[in-house]
Amino acid sequence: MSYISLEKLKNAWIFKHKSLPIKDTDLPKIKPMAKDRANVLWDAFISRQVDHPDFFKKGDWPFNDNNWHEQGKWEGIWDSNEEDLPELITTHIAWDNNTVVYYCSNRDNVIETTWAVFKRCWKNFLFMDDGCILVGKKRKESVQFNSNGTFKVGTKPS
């Protein structure tokens, strides 16, 4: 099985938070991966060395500062009534709405959705902000969200 139900996700409450409702049509498009599939994706797209962003080290592309181009702040926008992602992110990422994206929290926790759904529900996803990395399928652009309210936009090497 490639996915688990949203209800079985450890922190499923983030997608059911009353102050940040998600459309019924978007919920089925938020697909937590089963552990085995998450492990394979993490190893392929994020790191073969470590299982969590806190432990990135030399040899992990996210550890290399040259892969990150700019930094911005997300927390103020997250706390506001503004619904759109920070402009730096939407300027850096020009993906089609149907692009498959992966929100990678750690080796065992990867959530697949589309770019359109992520843009609409980003505030829900950012309840998990501990260095999580957003990457697109067959795309080089990436974003890392940090718990201090900042993010970095960059390019994942081929």
Predicted regions, residues:
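Structured alpha/beta or helical-core interaction and ligand-binding surfaces enriched in interleaved
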Residues: M1-T150, T155-S158
